[in-house]
Structure formats: structure tokens, C-alpha cells
């Protein structure tokens, strides 16, 4: 048993462990592992902090985007209301303009009708006077006829034009 290779490997391994322990190798290994664990823990803490910071930035971005969307919607609805109001005002102004033009045209037509009617009456009166004058001239003779004719024609003319 003392001469087997496994025995001497075991003795050498135990001797190696004793030497490593004496030199402080175990404490160096544990210190190295502890420092590595500490560094990993710090990196995890930093990653957690960065993740929380990113989540806060994302939440802020979402809040700002929501506010911007609300503001844009308010601007759009305001613009729509303004456009509708302006269109309604335009329609009202157009309707007023058309009504004024119609009223003006109707007044001009009524004035033209009245003027035409007066001209027709005047022309009819003149024609009636001329016809009457011609008939009376042919039928009545003398100075008395002329005086009667003038008086009658003046009377007829004034009555027809009134």
C-alpha cells in the first residue's frame, strides 16, 4: 500500500495542501473569491440602479408622450372648432350678402316697374290727348271750339297723369 502510485499521489496532495495553507494560499484564494463576489455584487447593484433609472426615464417619456398627445388633440379640436366657426360665419355672411343683393334687385325691379308704369300711363295720356285733339278738331270748328278743346285737353291730360 505504501508503494502504490495512488498512495503517493494522495501524500503529495496532502503535502501540497499543507504548504498552500502555510503560505496563506487559502486566504489569498478566499480573498480573491470574496473580492470577485463583491465586484459582481456591485455590478449587479449598478445594473439594478440603471434598470430602475431606465424605467423612470421610460415612465417619464410615456407621461410626456401622453401629455403631448393630449395637447395635440386639444390643438386639433380647437382648430376644428375654429374652422367650423369660421365656416359658419362665412355662410352667414354669404347669406346676408345674397339677401341684401336680392332685396336690392327686388327694389330696383319695383322701381323699374313703377317707372315703366308711369311712362306707359304718360304715353297713354299723351296718345289719348292727341287722339281726342284730332277728333275734336275734325268735328268742332271755330274759336269757341278751339277754347273748349284746349281746356278739355288740359283737364284730361292732368287727370290721366295723376
Swiss-Prot record:
Q: Is Repressor given among the entry's keywords?
A: no
For this UniProt entry, which segments traverse the membrane?
Answer: 1-21
For the keyword Ubl conjugation, the answer is: no
Among InterPro entries, the record links this protein to: ATP_synth_b/b'su_bac/chlpt, ATP_synthase_B_chain
Write out the annotated subcellular location: Cell inner membrane
Q: What is its main location?
A: membrane
Topology in the membrane?
Single-pass membrane protein
Gene Ontology terms for molecular function: proton-transporting ATP synthase activity, rotational mechanism; proton-transporting ATPase activity, rotational mechanism
Pfam families for this protein: ATP-synt_B
Q: Name one GO cellular component term.
A: plasma membrane
Keywords of the record: ATP synthesis, Cell inner membrane, Cell membrane, CF(0), Hydrogen ion transport, Ion transport, Membrane, Transmembrane, Transmembrane helix, Transport
Q: What does this protein do?
A: F(1)F(0) ATP synthase produces ATP from ADP in the presence of a proton or sodium gradient. F-type ATPases consist of two structural domains, F(1) containing the extramembraneous catalytic core and F(0) containing the membrane proton channel, linked together by a central stalk and a peripheral stalk. During catalysis, ATP synthesis in the catalytic domain of F(1) is coupled via a rotary mechanism of the central stalk subunits to proton translocation. Component of the F(0) channel, it forms part of the peripheral stalk, linking F(1) to F(0).
Return the HAMAP family for the record: ATP_synth_b_bprime
Family label:
Belongs to the ATPase B chain family.
Self-association state and partner proteins as the record states? F-type ATPases have 2 components, F(1) - the catalytic core - and F(0) - the membrane proton channel. F(1) has five subunits: alpha(3), beta(3), gamma(1), delta(1), epsilon(1). F(0) has three main subunits: a(1), b(2) and c(10-14). The alpha and beta chains form an alternating ring which encloses part of the gamma chain. F(1) is attached to F(0) by a central stalk formed by the gamma and epsilon chains, while a peripheral stalk is formed by the delta and b chains.
The name of this protein is: ATP synthase subunit b 1
Q: List the gene name.
A: atpF1
Amino acid at each position: 500500500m505504501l508503494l502504490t502510485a495512488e498512495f503517493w499521489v494522495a501524500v503529495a496532495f496532502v503535502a501540497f495542501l499543507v504548504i498552500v495553507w502555510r503560505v496563506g494560499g487559502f486566504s489569498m484564494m478566499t480573498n480573491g473569491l470574496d473580492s470577485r463576489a463583491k465586484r459582481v455584487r456591485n455590478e449587479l447593484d449598478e445594473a439594478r440602479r440603471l434598470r430602475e433609472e431606465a424605467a423612470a426615464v421610460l415612465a417619464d417619456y410615456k407621461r410626456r408622450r401622453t401629455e403631448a398627445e393630449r395637447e395635440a388633440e386639444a390643438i386639433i379640436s380647437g382648430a376644428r372648432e375654429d374652422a367650423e366657426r369660421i365656416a359658419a360665419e362665412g355662410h352667414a355672411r354669404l347669406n346676408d350678402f345674397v339677401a341684401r343683393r336680392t332685396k336690392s334687385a327686388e327694389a330696383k325691379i319695383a322701381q323699374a316697374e313703377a317707372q315703366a308704369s308711369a311712362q306707359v300711363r304718360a304715353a297713354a295720356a299723351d296718345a289719348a290727348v292727341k287722339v281726342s285733339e284730332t277728333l275734336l278738331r275734325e268735328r268742332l270748328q271755330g274759336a269757341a271750339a278751339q277754347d273748349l278743346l284746349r281746356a278739355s285737353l288740359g283737364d284730361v291730360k292732368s287727370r290721366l297723369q295723376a
